[in-house]
Amino acid sequence: MEDFVRQCFNPMIVELAEKAMKEYGEDPKIETNKFAAICTHLEVCFMYSDFHFIDERGESIIVESGDPNALLKHRFEIIEGRDRTMAWTVVNSICNTTGVEKPKFLPDLYDYKENRFIEIGVTRREVHIYYLEKANKIKSEKTHIHIFSFTGEEMATKADYTLDEESRARIKTRLFTIRQEMASRGLWDSFRQSERGEETIEERFEITGTMRRLADQSLPPNFSSLENFRAYVDGFEPNGCIEGKLSQMSKEVNARIEPFLKTTPRPLRLPDGPPCSQRSKFLLMDALKLSIEDPSHEGEGIPLYDAIKCMKTFFGWKEPNIIKPHEKGINPNYLLAWKQVLAELQDIENEEKIPKTKNMKKTSQLKWALGENMAPEKVDFEDCKDISDLKQYDSDEPEPRSLASWIQSEFNKACELTDSSWIELDEIGEDIAPIEHIASMRRNYFTAEVSHCRATEYIMKGVYINTALLNASCAAMDDFQVIPMISKCRTKEGRRKTNLYGFIIKGRSHLRNDTDVVNFVSMEFSLTDPRLEPHKWEKYCVLEIGDMLLRTAIGQVSRPMFLYVRTNGTSKIKMKWGMEMRRCLLQSLQQIESMIEAESSVKEKDMTKEFFENKSETWPIGESPKGVEEGSIGKVCRTLLAKSVFNSLYASPQLEGFSAESRKLLLIVQALRDNLEPGTFDLGGLYEAIEECLINDPWVLLNASWFNSFLTHALK
């Protein structure tokens, strides 16, 4: 390549290129591709200015050979190819005489006709990519950019190409010739691939005054001045050996960079112990609804009226009894609480005018269930700071739990379709700008895929319950208010439907801080027999409260109806997030959009329609022990939505930690799959950080087991 450069380019250009490389400490004999690139760039700059003059009338003219006495001025000032000091002197003098803004970086030319600096680019890649890099680097409206490629393409600011067609054709022909000459010598491929992106070397700006003093004070040890530190940092080779750099930086650091190979990662260790239990604020797949279609009763829309109406649709009530006690609780109190709800609802009906809200009598069973008077008495810190052995009371370490199969079933169920629609089209928000046509189309397609999804039912149920509970907590702080758990949907035929899942009774709720807790007792209908998976229902007391007739293929069958009762709690901040669960729709829509964008940029046109309507295509959904699971685009939408919804329903510090730490390992594995030869240090520490979050949370444990499946298949 070096020989080729010396043969192919004018000796003056070769000499300038060598000088420029030496100024930056680069060797033309070693970095031969760079040598060729600099020569090419210089030649293009010279050709750009050749033969272009300005005559005495100030008009731009082209003179190839002519009267040497004519009063002509060169149209372009060449800045490229001068040494830096000289180049900046020229730029400064141009700025002083013309009043043009001084550029941050050294440009290549100055155009006296258009009164602007020009940055010339010659690229072996796509012109628009290189153009954007240049524009991002110089960030100046004033400097004109003109990019040429070896394939005859060009791009210039505002499509203003400055020169006439013929002058530009000369440059393109020359570039094409260089390319052919290189190719015939087998040099082109290496030259084409060696082009790096634009590097940004900002011109140094001076730091003075207070900032300068602060900078000098905040230097690491052993550095006398900011200059001295800067020089040290600039000496870091980006691809030098990292270990040496780390040990240079600090005596304490002795990281050895280990290559990360297919055999390096081990699976995450999931905890042993009893199976994990359900911890969501309301039942998910096990919930049962009592529903009314086309509600038109008096007071329709008032939760208590709706609830009573729904209760009346069921005729199979019977004397309740406990069939799965709560290990630690006083179970008869749960039974009495349910009986009290039934009795007080009955009382309401006997009244002349049904009230809009109902506060329960403060019976001993409710006081117990809601933890009334259970909180330790608060003592002013001033009164006890002299006590010598004052300490926070010990809390037990959480008991490790193992992954149970129910959480995967819950997730699968959340991805399924129900026979009702849970959101209207406008649930995701209206268009703001007219350009949103494609966005609307995507949103409508997406809504169609997820409106019937069970995860969407969970969103609407969560929004309703959290809104109602937060309202009641503020409006009736001292009361044990009954809050019906309600949702609304539309049937296949488009008929409105109101559903009742059960009731919540809230405890005292003087919530001053975001994290202050309000206790509540939830009572939820279900057809699930708790004895099938008793570990899932550890925190519940389950009653049998009736028999329900179900229509099946073989006719009507009677099934026992259960009531799942438990004490629970939440806080203002959790209710605030619960009320905003609709955001899950937006998050998963954005994930789908980025998939469509990726497709569209490959095909260079908007692929929204094809993406949703090509039913034959399958997409990767996730990893399971069987391998990569695939499904239709609708299934992908629903799976992404379910993940987002479960992140909200099962939000916890364990999930935060696991997501943040496992992401690091995921990125390393992906780098390995992309053959980027990643290196790591203290991989053991990363594993520790991830596994510290695997304690007892069902959703985190499930994600960890998915992560292990991913590791297995990614590294095959």
UniProtKB/Swiss-Prot annotation:
GO biological process, one term: symbiont-mediated suppression of host gene expression
Required cofactor names: Mn(2+)
Presence of keyword Nuclease: yes
Enzyme class: hydrolase
GO MF annotations, alphabetized: endonuclease activity; metal ion binding; RNA binding
Motif (Nuclear localization signal 2 (NLS2)): 184-247
Cofactor note: Binds 2 manganese ions per subunit.
Chain ranges for the short sequence motif Nuclear localization signal 1 (NLS1) as given in the UniProt record: 124-139
PTM statement from Swiss-Prot or TrEMBL: Phosphorylated on serines and threonines by host kinases, including human casein kinase II.
Residues involved in Mn(2+) 1 binding: H41, D108, E119, I120
Cited Pfam families: Flu_PA
Location in the cell: Host cytoplasm; Host nucleus
Cited InterPro entries: INFV_PA (IPR037534), PA/PA-X (IPR001009), PA/PA-X_sf (IPR038372)
Record-listed Mn(2+) 2 binding positions: E80, D108
EC assignment: 3.1.-.-
One GO cellular component term noted in the UniProt record for this chain: host cell nucleus
Record flagged with keyword Aminoacyl-tRNA synthetase: no
Known function: Plays an essential role in viral RNA transcription and replication by forming the heterotrimeric polymerase complex together with PB1 and PB2 subunits. The complex transcribes viral mRNAs by using a unique mechanism called cap-snatching. It consists in the hijacking and cleavage of host capped pre-mRNAs. These short capped RNAs are then used as primers for viral mRNAs. The PB2 subunit is responsible for the binding of the 5' cap of cellular pre-mRNAs which are subsequently cleaved after 10-13 nucleotides by the PA subunit that carries the endonuclease activity.
Assembly description: Influenza RNA polymerase is composed of three subunits: PB1, PB2 and PA. Interacts (via C-terminus) with PB1 (via N-terminus).
Family: Belongs to the influenza viruses PA family.
Identification of the protein by name: Polymerase acidic protein
Organismal lineage: Viruses, Riboviria, Orthornavirae, Negarnaviricota, Polyploviricotina
